[in-house]
Amino acid sequence: MACSIVQFCSFQDLQSARDFLFPQLREETPGALRRDPSKTSNWEDDSWGAWEETEPQEPEEEGNTSKTQKHSWLQECVLSLSPTSDLMVIAREQKAAFLVRKWKHSDKGKEEMQFAVGWSGSVSAEEGEYVTSALCIPLASQKRSSTGRPDWTCIVVGFTSGYVRFYTEGVLLLAQLLNEDRVLQLKCRTYEIPRHPGVTEQNEELSILYPAAIVTIDGFSLFQSLRACRNQVAKAAASGNENIQPPPLAYKKWGLQDIDTIIDHASIGIMTLSPFDQMKTASNIGGFNAAIKNSPPAMSQYITVGSSPFTGFFYALEGSTQPLLSHVALAVASKLTSALFSAASGWLGWKSKHEEETVQKQKPKMEPATPLAVRFGLPDSRRHGESICLSPCNTLAAVTDDFGRVILLDVARGIAIRMWKGYRDAQIGWIQIVEDLHERVPEKGDFSPFGNTQGPSRVAQFLVIYAPRRGILEVWSTQQGPRVGAFNVGKHCRLLYPGYKIMGLNNVTSQSWQPQTYQICLVDPVSASVKAVNVPFHLALSDKKSERAKDLHLVKKLAALLRAKSPRPDSFEAEIKELILDIKYPATKKQALESILASDRVSFSCLRNVTQTSMDTLKNQELESVDEGLLQFCASKLKLLHLYESVSQLNTLDFHSDTPFSDNDLAVLLRLDDKELLKLRALLEKYKQENTKATVRFSEDADGVLPVKTFLEYLDYEKDALSIRKTSEEECVALGSFFFWKCLHGESSTEDMCHTLESAGLSPQQLLSLLLSVWLSKEKDILDKPQSVCCLHTMLSLLSKMKVAIDETWDSQSVSPWWQQMRMACIQSENNGAALLSAHVGHSVAAQMSSSATDKKFSQMVLDADAEALTDSWEALSLDTEYWKLLLRQLEDCLILQTLLHSRASPPAAKASSPQTEPLPRLSVKKLLEGGKGGIADSVAKWIFKQDLSPELLKCANREKDVENPDEPREGIARSPPEVSEVETDLGAVPDLLRLAYEQFPCSLELDVLHAHCCWEYVVQWNKDPEEARFLVRSIEHLRHILNPHVQNGISLMMWNTFLVKRFSAATYLMDKVGKSPKDRLCRRDVGMSDTALTSFLGSCLDLLQTSLEADISRDEVQVPVLDTEDAWLSVEGPTSIVELALEQKPIHYPLVEHHSILCSILYAAMSFSLKSVKPLALFDSKGKNAFFKDLTSIQLLPSGEMDPNFISVRQQFLLKVVSAAVQAQHSKDKDPSARAADTHGQDLNWTALAVDLAHHLQVSEDVIRRHYVGELYSYGADLLGEEAILQVQDKEVLASQLLVLTGQRLAHALFHTQTKEGMELLARLPPTLCTWLKAMNPQDLQNTGVPVAATAKLVHKVMELLPEKHGQYSLALHLIEAVEAMATL
């Protein structure tokens, strides 16, 4: 086992984060402007508001530079990843993006971790400050149930202004100004249990490096402060008070002296010198007269890298018994000289918003730093240090410099012990590996504590170096070890080594369960992935003389041999044997054997010989030195190989059954009579026709053939028992086909195969599972070859006779687990044809075995014995037989239903939308049993939606029931459903299949139940895409075809509350706001659909409300229906059906629904005719407005009594507009047939009748509306329709006066606007009174001026009939008659 680099996480959309941090790169990438919406659907739009702040782009001087910057942008960012891999920070200049962990299902069904942006924006609060460093520190939970686990992650960010700010999920917790210089580096140390008793226990701390100072914050104090701040932020957000003072913070501040520049640092922690080192150090500092203390003092050690010296070592003396001071002892500690403890000042508060507000405050007072001189260093005037990385055990440190060197330091001695060359701009990190005691191999003569599996675990450290110039990642064994791994990873990656784990643990909580934390990882922006480096412990032990290293070399050589393109067949096996025998370590030898067995390039004979050779070699060794695990591994693989060889030989034998097969034989075999067999054949034939699909088969995809490599992966030998590993359904089918496919086709001996598999150790239950998986998955081939039923019967009989298949002591009154296993497989299968056949075979074999057992028991009975034993046997037979009969009925029902759902109406009635083209899921008995009482009707409703069949077709297919119940669906003002002959022209076998389904499911597919489910399915699909208005129209059609008013009321109420009322209220408020029919853009924004779809939606709402009113009227006349279920489906469980929910609904409050119907009619009319200056809610008083959009079953305070005349006037004007618009629309349709075809909204609606009905409810005079309608008809020249409409007018005298004016307008147009000679002569002969009256008329009010004179004469005579003789205008009417008659003679 060698080093490996494994991807453990990926980015959801790293390119978007790059565009946010580097706006100048946004337009350079074509995909940046038009990103795939599927990739960005999970990102929060509000979090990316800062993207709009585009920066001016400067043209690139070179194309290569631009291309390189696209990939190397991560090198310019500040990057930090939490050790628990739950949060990542990417920052640049003033911007930062916080990425959170998400889990996503991959195509293989496994969960994969991804990073997605949870927050982004600007993190700078001071003008001109930039981000310089960042850390993600997970904080331990304080709850008992999650001790040792992370509770939340704090983000620490350092700035050029000197501020250090602490965040959580985009919210600023606190900000601290500890020094006025820029923050160079942030580093953290968390608690680790000491490995040895003599090792000093290190405290947690956060260290902040400035150009001339180091500030260390005690970890315990920081942990408590952060927890308090987080709690206070939550309280402030809840109460709205942001002026909560955060708790103080204790810290130390050291001023570093005698060094030119500092770039990076490492805080080693508290150390104690040995007595010799103590005296040596005291002599060097104070000379030979220096006083020596009895106990060595404790010191905090710091190492810096930079220049002059290249590496500096600092030691801060501490009191060995002096604890860290808290803020309570602040006054006492202010004058201490050893270290400066003070309460952190300068709190800026925090913000609950994503973007911080600018707060103008004075900078806090800076505490002076305690001077700390460098004790010694590594002087090198030309060398400048760039970074330092401390090892996990605090004994070694790696330093990089500007010469391209990586130098390994001994921290305790302060010397360089190793140097690597050629690593310019290197990034470094450490990996610490603990030895696994189970992998330790004892060697002879080794008596050390590490030589046995009971000794302590050893720890190895490896240095990881990433060289971006070369794009290589190397792993080195320390201190003087070789390179143990190298990987080509690209030139634009970032190596992340946090060097800490979870903050807030102690020696107790750290011993509890902890989540896995990574030690080092590589972020690759090109592949948008995060990779971890895995190093096995034994690589630390490898050297040139190591046996393990030799074994690894042989394993690599073996892998290369297996990968060879054209291995020599004559020597291939010999070379493999030689390599296997040369490997010494059992674990490595097992790994080598596994690689050989997993290779698909090694022949079966070679695998068998190599495994046998390894087995023989182990047996020839001394018993004490033989590894039992390896011996068992070889033995188990040999048994599997022998089984594979035996099955392959049986499958290749030329075996053909010569027994003829007839229909009579099949009937006898399945225990069916001729009628039942014919019915079964007919059902399977219809099923096969409707389920025929064009499939592609390749020659190499031969059934019954399984590579030995795959065979070994599927099976396992453990404790002398052969078991099948947990595999997928496809893998079970492949293994079962290898065992049984030839037998099912009669091409292999069934008896020999069963004997071979039983001898190998496979249990009958496993064999039955494999047999059924093959049979049920190969449905198409089985239905094409009925002879396979006989082979299945034989195979099942042989399996059932195995020893442990059916327990002989099983209680005769219980169900056999053997047959229950087979029934469960049939119940769960979605291939209903194969499942039905297998159930018939199982029923036949079970009955045959029960009969033979009964005969055997009967033959052993003595003559004087009681017949009780025979009775018990028949009870057992009856119990199991009933289960088989129930399953056969259920499978038959499921088969008929599946046949129906796969049938198609040809050609389709209308253009199918995308939801109608989606395939329906296949059915199984299990799905129907778990689907609830409405599962069957729901499945058929989904199919009806796919085919878009009309409700009339469902009624015709159920014509026999219609004869018994001749009630027709009620018709209202809604559009009548089309005739079947107009829509369904060629439906093929659909009506017959529907009729068969009705017969099979008389209760589940009762017509009202089916219409209810269809209604609900259509409205659900409409809700997904409101632009498909025809879905909602079709839903209302199904609703109106429901005969039972209780069901109809419940369904309509559920539809209204679930899908319609929100959109209806939004449309109401929108139209009331704009005062007219809204435009398309406004409709889409507020209601979620176009203006055209909105018009149809309002019409459907009106139909639904009218249907509810009609259903409420007839509720008391009809009883509540009783929902029955077929006997075979009484055990169904699952969700409550739609019809049951509908019957649970309360009755509606009739006046409230009528009130909503009035509003809906107003909205529908305004949208249909695009009326202007219409505010729907202005037509109602305050009571009417308050009652809208309330629960339709509740009792609301509605308008009553006399209405304000102002409201009545406004309502009358609206209704007159509707009538005028309706007549105008009808007139335009009569003149332009194309307009009639284009207009589909309200084309069959009698708008005048609707207006009159609205006038009745709105307290407007109905006769005014009728008279206006008559006048509009005559104005458009529709005199014949006008004569019919006159009959409905009550006040004929007022109508006659209005028509008299219209007649005058017609004559005025004919006389004054034609200007003919005859007309002028006629005008001169008219009476002066009539001339004056005609001149006062305005012919422009006429909508149609081309009316014949004869029609006008008829209108004048009609006016004379309507006017009484005493009327003031009667004489004027007489003069008009004379004038019209005179004009007729011209």
From Swiss-Prot:
Taxonomic superkingdom: Eukaryota
GO terms for biological process, alphabetical: establishment of protein localization to endoplasmic reticulum membrane; macroautophagy; positive regulation of autophagosome assembly; positive regulation of endoplasmic reticulum tubular network organization; positive regulation of protein lipidation; regulation of GTPase activity; synaptic signaling
Bias (Basic and acidic residues): 959-973
A GO cellular-component term linked to this record: endoplasmic reticulum
Main location: cytoplasm
GO molecular function, one term: enzyme regulator activity
Protein name (Swiss-Prot/TrEMBL): Rab3 GTPase-activating protein non-catalytic subunit
Gene: Rab3gap2
